[in-house]
Amino acid sequence: MADEHSFDISASVDIMEVKNALETAKKEVSSRFDFKGLKAQIELNEKEKTITLISSSDSKIDALKDIVLSKLIKREIPPVAITELKRESAGGANTKCSLKLNDTLDSLNAKKITKVIKDEKLKVNASIRGEEVRVTSKSIDELQNVIKLVKDLNLELPLSFKNLK
């Protein structure tokens, strides 16, 4: 039996699931009657982790966004993982919308998590390691209490708890 148990808290999005969800969304858009004959484009930029939606009007962009979000939810990607960056005219009568995939635990949220854990006065140690928070304790029950505590924070991030040892 190990003396110390630990796990890591990070924010992550499975990019393959995002690709699969977007392919499914493209298929649905191509078969929907309200998009027949209209420009409706969905693109993923893996490098910048953005999704670009292009369509003929704001209402069609909203419909595209709803389709994409529903497909992401079916692929178990939470809606908090997506943030709308901007909407702009894309030449002619088209409108362009950029969505950002939030998949990093920034230092502000990492500090908030560690502060809440330390304020709770549990018998655990929390430390920030780059884009993740490592939590260690002698008791697995304490670690499970920390997981529940962090989930109850309702941060606008797709949190994942990995490497429970």
Swiss-Prot record:
UniProt-listed SUPFAM superfamilies: YajQ-like (SSF89963)
Superkingdom classification of source: Bacteria
One Pfam family matching this protein: DUF520
Keywords (A to Z) from UniProt: Nucleotide-binding
Role, per record: Nucleotide-binding protein.
Similarity comment text for this entry: Belongs to the YajQ family.
Name assigned to this protein: Nucleotide-binding protein CFF8240_1664
Organism name: Campylobacter fetus subsp. fetus (strain 82-40)
